[in-house]
Regions:
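Positively charged, polyanion-binding regions of nucleic-acid-associated proteins
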Residues: 168-187
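Acidic-basic catalytic patches of nuclease active cores, encompassing PD-(D/E)XK
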Residues: 1-34
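Long, low-complexity, charged/polar intrinsically disordered regions in eukaryotic proteins
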Residues: 93-174
Length: 246
């Protein structure tokens, strides 16, 4: 039977895993905030399974108070979809063709980018496999959060963690600059960056659709990096703007 909580199973599982790993306590009041985890050293760990930028006010406040903050963000590289009838009977189970790459997190950073290079902030990205549970509906429906452009005959119920494949930490300029493939020339255009990202992921045996989706984030990557003072505009090449790393 599917269970529904305000806190997702994925969030809850990661919270308890990190609390055990860091000998921390969960749901701890810190000033006006309730923090997912506070370690025995007073460091804060926040689990964010959706838009990282939603944590901006909380993160800024904690950093201003001198806290070390780690944001843990799961990135789904493999998803199994289970669909259930309203009575809880399982009717289908399949693998989703969609696989996220590291570039999928960029959009969720657009509001928090001023804090990303703060010395006391670490972004820890988990590459995970999950099972997503859905409930069949009698008629097509939209979601309350308005995230659907078109009605569908199912609603999401739960996301369950299956495994953590690996972790990547982003804290320094060098960490973030690793998102720019080393094959790029010193001065480059957005099409150059798109091609380099696509080629790099192909070498890593990423499927074509995921490579294309990642390459399409090149413009957003440069939007972020120019504001983080990692990249600057340096001229024109035809109609294309030239960029270079700083």
């Amino acid at each position: 039977m599917i269970q529904t909580y305000n806190e997702s199973d994925l969030h809850r599982t990661l919270k308890h895993l990190y609390a055990l790993e860091h000998n921390g306590k969960t749901e701890v009041p810190v000033g006006k905030w309730i923090c997912d985890i506070v370690t025995e050293n007073g460091d804060v760990i926040e689990i964010q399974t959706a838009n990282i930028s939603k944590l901006t006010p909380k993160t800024k406040s904690l950093l201003d108070d001198g806290r070390n903050v780690t944001i843990v963000y799961p990135l789904v590289i493999e998803k199994t979809i289970e669909t259930y009838m309203p009575d809880g009977a399982l009717i289908s189970r399949r693998k989703s063709p969609k696989k996220q790459t590291i570039y999928a997190m960029l959009r969720s950073l657009t509001g928090i980018y001023p804090l990303l290079l703060h010395g006391n902030l670490t972004l820890e990205v988990l590459f995970v496999t999950i099972t997503e549970q859905r409930r069949k509906t009698a008629t097509p429906v939209r979601l309350a959060n308005k995230s659907r452009h078109f009605p569908k005959t199912w609603v999401p119920q739960e996301k369950k963690l299956e495994s953590i494949i690996r972790k990547e930490r982003y804290k320094t300029k060098a960490d973030y600059m690793a998102l720019i493939p080393p094959t790029l020339p010193h001065e480059f255009t957005i099409p150059n960056l798109q091609k380099a990202i696509f080629s790099k992921l192909q070498e890593d045996k990423t499927n074509k659709n995921s490579c294309t989706a990642a390459a399409n984030q090149a413009r957003l990557l440069l939007w972020l990096f120019t504001r983080m003072d990692l990249v600057e505009k340096c001229g024109k090449q035809g109609r294309c703007t030239l960029y270079r790393t700083k």
